[in-house]
Amino acid sequence: MDGLATPRPEVVFPSGEQRPALGLGTWRLGEDPARRASEVLALRQALDAGWRVIDSAEMYGNGGAEAVTGQALAEAQRAGLARGDVFVVSKVLPSHAGEQAMQAACEASLRRLGLDCIDLYLLHWRGAVPLAETVRGFEQLQRRGWIRLWGVSNFDLADMRELFEVPGGKACAANQVYYSLSQRGVEFDLLPWQRLHQMPLMAYSPFDQGALVDHPLLHAVAQRHRATPAQVALAWGLQQPGAMLLPKAGNALHLRHNWAAQELRLSADDLAELDRSFPSPRRKSPLAML
């Protein structure tokens, strides 16, 4: 890759806490016991390489992804990694978003993760439980010391505004949504609103389910920088203020390539060319979800 090393991008949470803008997603991990050892190894390699944000959920692999994450964290800590250096994110299902059900769900997640406290606990998507009750549940978990921060996922702007009207709702620390170079709908109103409130937008599927890595334009831009199309997709996202990207944990080669994307700085001409093929939205559209 061309160019000098650049500072690794970070995001700032409403509390002022700073964390890396590049983290690891764990969707599809923990689904097959036959892959357990290789998945734990991949996460261990990521932690050894410097990755410090891991995103999981009770839904992923029916708790299996949290178990894989927990085993990798335990092994890394035995090797000397400090717990406080890793920012662990998990999510509660909407069906568990009531006060009592959330306590049980969080306790189970903590057990699978092998942790005393989750750094950021998200409502995976909005369900039938009133937001006020969900916020009270998050606050109870904070008082117990089981979570540090709480947030939401797959919330559009109207949902965020409604959340902010709920007592305690303004303590929301983040919103995780589907966002990439080819899925830019949130730029119309949600992303600017979150920037205004200094609330990171956590982006899942930054390769748009792999579609971007096959796009001819990303191949052309990558060739100019002696990079890969995946690195171009990540570099674009990392240059969007307030965005934290969560590519899925893969094999060792993919981990190295994704990590190196932090060193790639796209030029103004690169960004303009990408904008022409993947323009920012001019009107409101329904929130994209996976």
Please place each PLM-identified region on the residue numbering.
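Beta/alpha (TIM)-barrel catalytic core signal, keyed to glycine-rich beta->alpha loops juxtaposed to Asp/Glu
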Residues: 3, 126-290
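Aromatic/hydrophobic pocket-lining residues that form the small-molecule binding cavity
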Residues: 39, 69, 102, 106, ...
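Active-site mouth loops of central-metabolism enzymes
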Residues: 25-37, 90-100, 124
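N-terminal binding-site loop/beta-alpha segment at the start of enzyme catalytic domains
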Residues: 1-84, 290
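A short, structured active-site edge motif that brings together acidic residues
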Residues: 82-96, 120-124, 154, 177-179
